[in-house]
Design a protein with these regions (language model features):
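Short loop/turn segments immediately following the C-termini of beta-strands
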Residues: 82, 127-129, 181-183, 228-231, ...
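Repeated scaffold domains used in trafficking and secretory/extracellular systems
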Residues: 64-71, 106-116, 158-169, 209-217, ...
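Structural motif
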Residues: 85-88, 131-140, 185-192, 232-243, ...
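Beta-strand-rich domains and repeat architectures in extracellular enzymes and scaffolds
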Residues: 56-83, 111
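A short helix->beta-strand "capping" segment at the edge of beta-propeller domains
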Residues: 39-65
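Blade-loop segments of beta-propeller domains
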Residues: 94-129
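Loop/turn-rich, solvent-exposed surfaces of beta-rich toroidal or solenoidal domains
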Residues: 208-249
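A short beta-strand motif characteristic of beta-propeller blades
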Residues: 52-62, 94-106, 148-157, 199-206, ...
C-alpha cells in the first residue's frame, strides 16, 4: 500500500495493515501446498492473537466527577476520583458519593486508582502517591450500596510491586489482578491474588511492556489494560492493550485500540465492560497538563480538568 504526505495512520491502523499483510502472505504460501482444515484453523488462531479482538464503535460520552477509575455491575456506574468514590445511574445522574473513602483504613492513603465491582463490593487500589512515586499499597473493599469501607486484602511487598494504578477481578478463576503505573521492574508485570483467601499468587511479565499502565479489566478470558502512552502535547492518542494470560510466567501484549475518537487528547485512566450491554467504558481526562501523574496547570481554553466516560459498542472480529 502507499501513503501520502498528508496521511499519517494511527498505530492501530498501521499494525492492522502490517499484520493482515503478513497473514495474507503466509496463507498464500500455505495455499500452494496441501493444507488440512486443522492446519488452517491453527494458522488462523495463531494470527488472531496478534490482532485486535473487537471492533469498537463510539456510542457517546458522559461527564463524571472522578478522574481515576470506572466500574459497572450492569445497573450502575462506579467512578473513582483520587480521594473519592461516586455512584451514577447509566444516564449519568449522580446517585451517591463518598468523599472521605479512606476512613477506617489501617494505613493512611491519599490516592485511589482504577476500581472494579464484583458481588456487591467495590475493589479499590489505594496508596500514598506523590510526583510519580507510590508507597503503602492497599487492596481495599467498599460496599457498592453505601460506598463505605468494609475490609482490606493483605498486600505482598515481596511481589516487587512499587505502585498500584488499577485492580480487577477475574470472575472465572476467582482471582484479583493489579497493575502498576511506575515503570522499570514494577511496571513490567501484572500481579495476581486469590479472591477467596487474599493470598498473593504470582506476577506475570508482559511482552512487550506497555508504557504508563493506568487500568486493568478482565473480560472473556483476557485482560485489558489502558496505557497513557500518547503525548497529549502532540495530539497523540493513548491505547488499550489485550493480554492473553495463561499459567506461564509471561504473556504477550497485543494492541487492541487507539483512543482516536476522544474530544481532545489527554490522559486515559480506567476501563471496564458493562456486563449487561457488553459496552466498553473508558474514563478519559482532558484539559489538564499531567507531569509524573500530577496536574501542572491547564491547556489553552481550559480552566479545569474534564472527566468523561466514553461508551463503545463492541463487535468481535473474526479472521477467516
Amino acid at each position: 500500500w502507499a501513503f501520502t504526505f498528508t496521511f499519517q495512520p494511527t498505530m492501530e491502523v498501521f499494525m492492522k495493515k502490517v499484520l493482515m499483510l503478513l497473514a495474507a502472505v503466509s496463507l498464500l504460501s500455505w495455499s500452494v501446498s496441501p493444507c488440512s482444515a486443522k492446519e488452517s484453523k491453527d494458522l488462523a488462531k495463531t494470527y488472531s492473537q496478534w490482532l485486535p479482538k473487537y471492533e469498537y464503535k463510539l456510542k457517546d460520552a458522559i461527564e463524571v466527577k472522578g478522574r481515576q477509575g470506572i466500574a459497572s455491575d450492569g445497573e450502575f456506574y462506579y467512578v473513582s476520583n483520587s480521594k473519592a468514590l461516586y455512584k451514577y445511574d447509566k444516564t449519568g445522574k449522580l446517585i451517591a458519593s463518598n468523599e472521605n473513602p479512606f476512613e477506617g483504613y489501617a494505613i493512611p492513603s491519599n490516592h485511589i486508582g482504577d476500581i472494579d465491582v464484583f458481588n456487591g463490593e467495590i475493589f479499590v487500589s489505594a496508596e500514598n502517591f506523590m510526583d510519580g512515586v507510590g508507597k503503602d499499597i492497599q487492596i481495599a473493599i467498599h460496599d457498592a450500596k453505601t460506598l463505605k469501607f468494609k475490609r482490606t486484602f493483605k498486600f505482598e511487598p515481596s511481589s516487587g510491586q512499587e505502585e498500584v494504578s488499577g485492580i480487577c477481578v477475574d470472575r472465572d478463576k476467582r482471582t484479583v489482578w493489579m497493575c502498576s503505573w511506575v515503570g522499570e521492574n514494577s511496571g513490567r508485570y501484572l500481579y495476581e491474588y486469590s479472591l477467596d483467601t487474599g493470598k498473593y499468587l504470582r506476577k506475570v511479565h508482559l511482552f512487550p511492556v506497555p508504557q504508563w499502565v493506568q487500568g486493568v479489566f478482565y473480560y472473556k478470558g483476557a485482560l485489558y489494560v489502558t496505557a497513557d502512552d500518547g503525548e497529549a502535547d502532540f495530539d497523540e492518542p493513548d491505547h488499550i492493550y489485550r493480554i492473553n494470560v495463561s499459567d506461564g510466567t509471561s504473556a504477550m501484549v497485543t494492541l487492541e485500540k487507539s483512543l482516536t475518537e476522544v474530544k481532545k487528547q489527554g490522559e486515559i485512566e480506567g476501563l471496564c465492560v458493562d456486563p449487561k450491554t457488553d459496552e466498553m467504558l473508558v474514563l478519559y481526562n482532558r484539559g489538564a497538563r499531567i507531569i509524573l501523574g500530577m496536574g501542572k496547570g491547564f491547556y489553552p481554553g481550559y480552566d479545569h480538568e474534564i472527566h468523561e466516560v466514553y461508551r463503545y459498542r463492541m463487535t468481535e472480529l473474526k479472521l477467516k
